[in-house]
Amino acid sequence: MTNEAIIQLKDIDVTFHNKGQTVTAVKNVSLTVNRGDIYGVVGYSGAGKSTLVRVINRLQQPTAGTVEVNGQDILGLPSKELRVARTKIGMIFQHFNLMASRTIADNVGYPLKGGTLTREERQKKVAHLLELVGLTEKATDYPAQLSGGQKQRVAIARALANDPEILISDEATSALDPKTTSSILELLKRLNQELGLTVVLITHEMEAVKEICNKVAVMDAGEIIERGDLVTIFSQPHEKLTQDFINTATQINQALTKIYKQAQTLGLDDHQQLVQLQYVGASTDAPLITELYKRFEVVSNILYGNVEILQDTPLGNLIVVMTGAPDKLAAAWQYCQSAGITVTHLQPTDPEVA
Protein backbone atom coordinates (compact mmCIF):
# COMPACT_ATOMS: atom_id res chain seq x y z
CA MET A 1 0.00 0.00 0.00
CA THR A 2 1.20 3.49 -0.85
CA ASN A 3 -0.16 7.02 -0.87
CA GLU A 4 -0.03 7.04 -4.66
CA ALA A 5 -3.51 7.28 -6.15
CA ILE A 6 -4.19 4.69 -8.85
CA ILE A 7 -7.95 5.40 -9.19
CA GLN A 8 -9.50 8.84 -8.78
CA LEU A 9 -13.21 9.37 -9.28
CA LYS A 10 -14.39 12.95 -8.85
CA ASP A 11 -17.98 14.22 -8.67
CA ILE A 12 -19.39 11.20 -10.50
CA ASP A 13 -23.06 11.22 -11.50
CA VAL A 14 -24.74 8.39 -13.39
CA THR A 15 -28.28 9.01 -14.58
CA PHE A 16 -30.54 6.68 -16.55
CA HIS A 17 -33.58 7.70 -18.59
CA ASN A 18 -36.32 5.18 -19.23
CA LYS A 19 -39.87 5.76 -20.49
CA GLY A 20 -39.87 9.38 -19.47
CA GLN A 21 -38.46 8.67 -16.02
CA THR A 22 -35.05 9.74 -14.73
CA VAL A 23 -33.20 7.53 -12.27
CA THR A 24 -30.01 8.70 -10.58
CA ALA A 25 -27.94 5.60 -9.80
CA VAL A 26 -24.83 7.46 -8.60
CA LYS A 27 -24.93 10.97 -7.19
CA ASN A 28 -21.91 13.26 -6.79
CA VAL A 29 -19.48 10.53 -5.68
CA SER A 30 -15.75 11.06 -5.28
CA LEU A 31 -13.43 8.19 -4.42
CA THR A 32 -9.66 7.74 -4.31
CA VAL A 33 -8.06 4.30 -4.28
CA ASN A 34 -4.33 4.13 -3.63
CA ARG A 35 -1.96 1.66 -5.25
CA GLY A 36 -1.95 -1.59 -3.28
CA ASP A 37 -5.25 -0.96 -1.50
CA ILE A 38 -7.91 -3.59 -1.03
CA TYR A 39 -10.77 -1.11 -1.04
CA GLY A 40 -14.22 -2.36 -0.11
CA VAL A 41 -17.37 -0.67 -1.38
CA VAL A 42 -20.29 -2.02 0.60
CA GLY A 43 -24.02 -1.41 0.30
CA TYR A 44 -27.33 -3.14 -0.16
CA SER A 45 -28.71 -4.04 -3.59
CA GLY A 46 -29.57 -0.91 -5.54
CA ALA A 47 -27.11 1.30 -3.63
CA GLY A 48 -25.22 2.09 -6.85
CA LYS A 49 -21.94 0.38 -6.02
CA SER A 50 -21.74 -1.81 -9.15
CA THR A 51 -22.68 1.11 -11.38
CA LEU A 52 -19.96 3.20 -9.73
CA VAL A 53 -17.13 0.72 -10.29
CA ARG A 54 -18.13 0.13 -13.91
CA VAL A 55 -17.24 3.78 -14.41
CA ILE A 56 -13.60 2.95 -13.58
CA ASN A 57 -13.02 1.18 -16.91
CA ARG A 58 -15.77 3.08 -18.70
CA LEU A 59 -18.08 0.11 -19.06
CA GLN A 60 -20.50 2.71 -17.73
CA GLN A 61 -20.25 6.23 -19.10
CA PRO A 62 -20.88 8.73 -16.30
CA THR A 63 -23.30 11.59 -16.80
CA ALA A 64 -20.89 13.93 -15.04
CA GLY A 65 -17.52 13.83 -13.32
CA THR A 66 -13.93 12.80 -14.07
CA VAL A 67 -12.16 9.43 -13.99
CA GLU A 68 -8.40 8.99 -13.73
CA VAL A 69 -6.71 5.60 -13.66
CA ASN A 70 -2.92 5.54 -13.41
CA GLY A 71 -2.92 9.24 -14.23
CA GLN A 72 -4.89 8.72 -17.46
CA ASP A 73 -8.14 10.52 -18.19
CA ILE A 74 -10.23 7.44 -18.96
CA LEU A 75 -13.19 9.44 -20.23
CA GLY A 76 -11.02 11.22 -22.79
CA LEU A 77 -9.38 8.15 -24.31
CA PRO A 78 -10.15 7.20 -27.93
CA SER A 79 -11.43 3.64 -28.50
CA LYS A 80 -8.02 2.08 -29.25
CA GLU A 81 -6.30 3.59 -26.21
CA LEU A 82 -9.30 2.69 -24.04
CA ARG A 83 -9.00 -0.96 -25.04
CA VAL A 84 -5.33 -0.92 -24.02
CA ALA A 85 -6.16 0.77 -20.70
CA ARG A 86 -8.86 -1.83 -19.99
CA THR A 87 -6.33 -4.66 -20.22
CA LYS A 88 -4.80 -3.31 -17.01
CA ILE A 89 -8.14 -3.50 -15.19
CA GLY A 90 -9.32 -7.06 -14.56
CA MET A 91 -12.88 -7.86 -13.48
CA ILE A 92 -14.58 -10.82 -11.85
CA PHE A 93 -18.30 -11.19 -11.23
CA GLN A 94 -20.86 -13.25 -9.34
CA HIS A 95 -21.39 -15.30 -12.52
CA PHE A 96 -18.20 -16.92 -13.77
CA ASN A 97 -18.94 -16.61 -17.53
CA LEU A 98 -16.72 -19.54 -18.46
CA MET A 99 -16.93 -21.16 -21.89
CA ALA A 100 -18.38 -24.61 -21.30
CA SER A 101 -16.90 -26.17 -24.43
CA ARG A 102 -13.32 -25.10 -23.66
CA THR A 103 -10.88 -26.56 -21.17
CA ILE A 104 -9.87 -24.64 -18.07
CA ALA A 105 -6.50 -23.81 -19.66
CA ASP A 106 -8.24 -22.51 -22.80
CA ASN A 107 -10.60 -20.36 -20.70
CA VAL A 108 -7.69 -18.80 -18.83
CA GLY A 109 -5.67 -18.23 -22.00
CA TYR A 110 -8.52 -16.78 -24.03
CA PRO A 111 -7.65 -13.08 -23.32
CA LEU A 112 -4.14 -13.74 -24.67
CA LYS A 113 -5.35 -14.69 -28.15
CA GLY A 114 -4.33 -12.17 -30.76
CA GLY A 115 -1.57 -10.84 -28.52
CA THR A 116 2.17 -10.79 -29.02
CA LEU A 117 2.97 -14.00 -27.13
CA THR A 118 3.95 -17.16 -28.99
CA ARG A 119 1.93 -20.33 -28.41
CA GLU A 120 4.66 -21.67 -26.12
CA GLU A 121 4.73 -18.42 -24.13
CA ARG A 122 0.93 -18.48 -23.81
CA GLN A 123 1.00 -22.05 -22.51
CA LYS A 124 3.70 -21.15 -20.01
CA LYS A 125 1.75 -18.13 -18.80
CA VAL A 126 -1.49 -20.10 -18.46
CA ALA A 127 0.35 -22.73 -16.42
CA HIS A 128 1.71 -19.99 -14.15
CA LEU A 129 -1.75 -18.43 -13.71
CA LEU A 130 -3.31 -21.79 -12.85
CA GLU A 131 -0.54 -22.36 -10.32
CA LEU A 132 -1.25 -18.94 -8.80
CA VAL A 133 -4.88 -19.84 -8.14
CA GLY A 134 -4.18 -23.43 -7.10
CA LEU A 135 -5.68 -25.21 -10.11
CA THR A 136 -2.66 -26.69 -11.89
CA GLU A 137 -4.18 -30.17 -11.93
CA LYS A 138 -7.44 -28.88 -13.51
CA ALA A 139 -5.88 -27.55 -16.73
CA THR A 140 -7.46 -30.16 -19.00
CA ASP A 141 -10.81 -30.32 -17.19
CA TYR A 142 -13.97 -28.53 -18.32
CA PRO A 143 -16.05 -26.03 -16.31
CA ALA A 144 -18.82 -28.57 -15.65
CA GLN A 145 -16.32 -30.68 -13.70
CA LEU A 146 -15.48 -27.86 -11.26
CA SER A 147 -17.10 -26.60 -8.07
CA GLY A 148 -18.32 -23.03 -7.75
CA GLY A 149 -15.20 -21.97 -5.89
CA GLN A 150 -12.95 -23.55 -8.49
CA LYS A 151 -14.85 -21.82 -11.29
CA GLN A 152 -14.31 -18.48 -9.56
CA ARG A 153 -10.59 -19.25 -9.31
CA VAL A 154 -10.57 -19.85 -13.07
CA ALA A 155 -12.30 -16.49 -13.56
CA ILE A 156 -9.64 -14.83 -11.38
CA ALA A 157 -6.82 -16.46 -13.36
CA ARG A 158 -8.43 -15.31 -16.61
CA ALA A 159 -8.78 -11.76 -15.24
CA LEU A 160 -5.03 -11.77 -14.48
CA ALA A 161 -4.00 -12.92 -17.96
CA ASN A 162 -2.96 -9.45 -19.17
CA ASP A 163 -1.08 -8.58 -15.96
CA PRO A 164 -3.58 -5.99 -14.69
CA GLU A 165 -2.66 -3.55 -11.97
CA ILE A 166 -6.27 -3.37 -10.76
CA LEU A 167 -8.77 -6.15 -10.10
CA ILE A 168 -12.43 -5.27 -9.63
CA SER A 169 -14.42 -7.92 -7.78
CA ASP A 170 -18.13 -7.24 -8.32
CA GLU A 171 -20.05 -9.44 -5.85
CA ALA A 172 -17.72 -12.29 -6.85
CA THR A 173 -18.40 -14.31 -3.69
CA SER A 174 -22.16 -13.71 -3.44
CA ALA A 175 -23.13 -17.12 -4.86
CA LEU A 176 -20.58 -19.08 -2.82
CA ASP A 177 -20.90 -20.83 0.52
CA PRO A 178 -19.09 -19.28 3.54
CA LYS A 179 -16.10 -21.65 3.48
CA THR A 180 -15.54 -21.16 -0.25
CA THR A 181 -16.04 -17.41 0.11
CA SER A 182 -13.31 -17.31 2.75
CA SER A 183 -10.89 -19.21 0.49
CA ILE A 184 -11.55 -16.85 -2.45
CA LEU A 185 -11.03 -13.81 -0.22
CA GLU A 186 -7.76 -15.29 1.04
CA LEU A 187 -6.69 -15.79 -2.57
CA LEU A 188 -7.44 -12.14 -3.40
CA LYS A 189 -5.45 -11.04 -0.36
CA ARG A 190 -2.50 -13.20 -1.38
CA LEU A 191 -2.57 -11.85 -4.94
CA ASN A 192 -2.64 -8.32 -3.53
CA GLN A 193 0.48 -9.06 -1.48
CA GLU A 194 2.42 -11.11 -4.02
CA LEU A 195 1.58 -9.18 -7.20
CA GLY A 196 1.03 -5.71 -5.74
CA LEU A 197 -2.48 -5.95 -7.17
CA THR A 198 -4.92 -3.18 -6.26
CA VAL A 199 -8.32 -4.71 -5.48
CA VAL A 200 -11.71 -2.97 -5.47
CA LEU A 201 -14.17 -5.25 -3.69
CA ILE A 202 -17.87 -4.63 -4.33
CA THR A 203 -20.10 -6.46 -1.87
CA HIS A 204 -23.21 -6.32 0.29
CA GLU A 205 -21.43 -8.33 2.98
CA MET A 206 -19.40 -6.41 5.57
CA GLU A 207 -17.99 -9.79 6.63
CA ALA A 208 -16.05 -9.91 3.33
CA VAL A 209 -14.78 -6.37 3.87
CA LYS A 210 -13.68 -7.27 7.38
CA GLU A 211 -11.72 -10.27 6.10
CA ILE A 212 -9.35 -8.54 3.66
CA CYS A 213 -9.94 -4.81 3.11
CA ASN A 214 -7.79 -2.00 4.48
CA LYS A 215 -10.30 0.71 3.49
CA VAL A 216 -14.05 0.81 3.06
CA ALA A 217 -16.74 3.08 1.66
CA VAL A 218 -20.42 2.61 2.51
CA MET A 219 -22.96 3.44 -0.22
CA ASP A 220 -26.66 4.14 0.10
CA ALA A 221 -29.07 5.46 -2.53
CA GLY A 222 -26.25 6.31 -4.95
CA GLU A 223 -24.10 8.21 -2.46
CA ILE A 224 -21.10 7.38 -0.30
CA ILE A 225 -22.32 8.07 3.22
CA GLU A 226 -19.17 7.07 5.08
CA ARG A 227 -15.58 6.09 4.26
CA GLY A 228 -12.27 5.51 5.96
CA ASP A 229 -9.71 2.93 7.00
CA LEU A 230 -11.16 -0.36 8.20
CA VAL A 231 -10.29 -0.07 11.89
CA THR A 232 -11.66 3.48 12.18
CA ILE A 233 -14.91 2.57 10.44
CA PHE A 234 -15.42 -0.49 12.65
CA SER A 235 -14.51 1.29 15.88
CA GLN A 236 -16.08 4.71 15.22
CA PRO A 237 -18.96 4.42 12.73
CA HIS A 238 -21.01 7.59 12.34
CA GLU A 239 -23.93 6.41 10.23
CA LYS A 240 -26.63 4.00 11.38
CA LEU A 241 -26.38 1.96 8.16
CA THR A 242 -22.65 1.51 8.74
CA GLN A 243 -23.32 0.38 12.31
CA ASP A 244 -25.93 -2.09 11.05
CA PHE A 245 -23.42 -3.61 8.63
CA ILE A 246 -20.80 -3.84 11.37
CA ASN A 247 -23.19 -5.41 13.87
CA THR A 248 -24.03 -8.10 11.34
CA ALA A 249 -20.37 -8.79 10.54
CA THR A 250 -19.31 -9.01 14.19
CA GLN A 251 -22.31 -11.13 15.29
CA ILE A 252 -23.36 -8.45 17.79
CA ASN A 253 -26.86 -8.31 16.30
CA GLN A 254 -27.42 -11.97 17.10
CA ALA A 255 -26.17 -11.48 20.65
CA LEU A 256 -28.35 -8.40 21.20
CA THR A 257 -31.42 -10.16 19.85
CA LYS A 258 -30.98 -13.01 22.33
CA ILE A 259 -30.25 -10.63 25.20
CA TYR A 260 -33.27 -8.44 24.46
CA LYS A 261 -35.55 -11.46 24.25
CA GLN A 262 -34.41 -12.31 27.77
CA ALA A 263 -34.59 -8.69 28.95
CA GLN A 264 -37.42 -9.35 31.39
CA THR A 265 -35.41 -12.07 33.10
CA LEU A 266 -32.48 -9.67 33.59
CA GLY A 267 -34.53 -7.78 36.18
CA LEU A 268 -32.46 -4.58 35.96
CA ASP A 269 -32.93 -2.05 38.76
CA ASP A 270 -31.58 1.45 39.47
CA HIS A 271 -28.22 -0.01 40.42
CA GLN A 272 -27.77 -1.89 37.16
CA GLN A 273 -27.11 -0.90 33.55
CA LEU A 274 -26.95 -2.91 30.34
CA VAL A 275 -23.87 -1.58 28.54
CA GLN A 276 -21.85 -2.23 25.39
CA LEU A 277 -18.11 -1.60 25.71
CA GLN A 278 -16.04 -1.28 22.55
CA TYR A 279 -12.28 -1.01 22.72
CA VAL A 280 -9.48 -0.98 20.17
CA GLY A 281 -5.74 -1.67 20.10
CA ALA A 282 -3.86 -1.82 23.38
CA SER A 283 -7.08 -1.31 25.36
CA THR A 284 -8.02 -4.92 24.59
CA ASP A 285 -5.13 -6.12 26.78
CA ALA A 286 -6.28 -4.21 29.87
CA PRO A 287 -8.00 -6.21 32.69
CA LEU A 288 -11.04 -3.93 32.46
CA ILE A 289 -13.57 -5.95 34.47
CA THR A 290 -11.11 -6.38 37.34
CA GLU A 291 -10.20 -2.68 37.32
CA LEU A 292 -13.85 -1.59 37.46
CA TYR A 293 -14.37 -3.68 40.56
CA LYS A 294 -11.11 -2.67 42.27
CA ARG A 295 -11.56 1.05 41.60
CA PHE A 296 -15.32 1.52 41.87
CA GLU A 297 -16.78 -1.68 43.34
CA VAL A 298 -18.72 -2.09 40.11
CA VAL A 299 -19.46 -5.71 39.26
CA SER A 300 -19.69 -6.52 35.53
CA ASN A 301 -21.57 -9.61 34.43
CA ILE A 302 -20.44 -10.48 30.89
CA LEU A 303 -23.31 -11.50 28.60
CA TYR A 304 -21.30 -11.42 25.36
CA GLY A 305 -17.67 -10.97 24.41
CA ASN A 306 -15.78 -10.90 21.14
CA VAL A 307 -12.36 -9.79 19.86
CA GLU A 308 -11.74 -9.29 16.14
CA ILE A 309 -8.32 -8.75 14.56
CA LEU A 310 -8.65 -6.10 11.85
CA GLN A 311 -5.51 -5.14 9.91
CA ASP A 312 -3.43 -6.54 12.80
CA THR A 313 -5.35 -4.37 15.27
CA PRO A 314 -7.52 -5.99 17.99
CA LEU A 315 -11.08 -4.68 18.23
CA GLY A 316 -13.07 -5.90 21.23
CA ASN A 317 -16.75 -5.82 22.13
CA LEU A 318 -18.34 -6.65 25.46
CA ILE A 319 -21.99 -6.55 26.45
CA VAL A 320 -22.23 -6.47 30.23
CA VAL A 321 -24.62 -5.76 33.07
CA MET A 322 -22.87 -3.28 35.36
CA THR A 323 -23.99 -3.34 38.99
CA GLY A 324 -23.10 -0.66 41.54
CA ALA A 325 -24.19 2.53 43.25
CA PRO A 326 -25.33 5.21 40.75
CA ASP A 327 -22.37 7.48 41.50
CA LYS A 328 -19.97 4.54 41.18
CA LEU A 329 -21.52 3.56 37.85
CA ALA A 330 -21.05 7.12 36.57
CA ALA A 331 -17.41 7.09 37.70
CA ALA A 332 -16.87 3.71 36.03
CA TRP A 333 -18.26 5.11 32.76
CA GLN A 334 -15.86 8.06 32.93
CA TYR A 335 -12.95 5.72 33.62
CA CYS A 336 -13.81 3.60 30.58
CA GLN A 337 -14.12 6.63 28.34
CA SER A 338 -10.82 8.11 29.56
CA ALA A 339 -9.20 4.77 28.66
CA GLY A 340 -10.40 5.12 25.07
CA ILE A 341 -13.30 2.70 25.46
CA THR A 342 -16.60 3.56 23.78
CA VAL A 343 -19.49 3.08 26.20
CA THR A 344 -23.08 2.69 24.96
CA HIS A 345 -26.06 2.39 27.30
CA LEU A 346 -28.36 -0.25 25.80
CA GLN A 347 -32.11 -0.13 26.26
CA PRO A 348 -33.70 -3.60 26.17
CA THR A 349 -36.98 -2.11 24.99
CA ASP A 350 -35.37 -0.29 22.05
CA PRO A 351 -37.21 -1.56 18.92
CA GLU A 352 -34.33 -0.39 16.71
CA VAL A 353 -32.06 -3.08 18.07
CA ALA A 354 -34.44 -5.74 19.36
Swiss-Prot record:
User: CDD domains per the record?
Assistant: ABC_MetN_methionine_transporter
- Quote the record's binding site residues for ATP: G43, Y44, S45, G46, A47, G48, K49, S50
Q: Which residues form the ABC transporter domain?
A: 9-246
According to Swiss-Prot or TrEMBL, what is its membrane topology? Peripheral membrane protein
Keywords noted in UniProt: Amino-acid transport, ATP-binding, Cell membrane, Membrane, Nucleotide-binding, Translocase, Transport
Enzyme Commission code: 7.4.2.11
Q: What is its main location?
A: membrane
Q: Name one GO cellular component term.
A: plasma membrane
Q: Give one Pfam family, short name only.
A: ABC_tran
UniProt GO MF annotations: ABC-type D-methionine transporter activity; ATP binding; ATP hydrolysis activity
Compartment(s): Cell membrane
At the top level of its lineage, which domain of life is listed? Answer: Bacteria
The chemistry this enzyme catalyses reads: L-methionine(out) + ATP + H2O = L-methionine(in) + ADP + phosphate + H(+); D-methionine(out) + ATP + H2O = D-methionine(in) + ADP + phosphate + H(+)
Which residues, by range, are in coiled-coil regions? none
Stored InterPro entries = AAA+_ATPase, ABC_transporter-like_ATP-bd, ABC_transporter-like_CS, ACT-like_dom_sf, MetN_ABC, MetN_ABC_transporter-like, NIL_domain, P-loop_NTPase
Q: What does this protein do?
A: Part of the ABC transporter complex MetNIQ involved in methionine import. Responsible for energy coupling to the transport system.
Subunit annotation: The complex is composed of two ATP-binding proteins (MetN), two transmembrane proteins (MetI) and a solute-binding protein (MetQ).
Q: Which family is annotated? A: Belongs to the ABC transporter superfamily. Methionine importer (TC 3.A.1.24) family.
What name does this protein carry? Methionine import ATP-binding protein MetN
Organism from which the protein derives: Levilactobacillus brevis (strain ATCC 367 / BCRC 12310 / CIP 105137 / JCM 1170 / LMG 11437 / NCIMB 947 / NCTC 947) (Lactobacillus brevis)
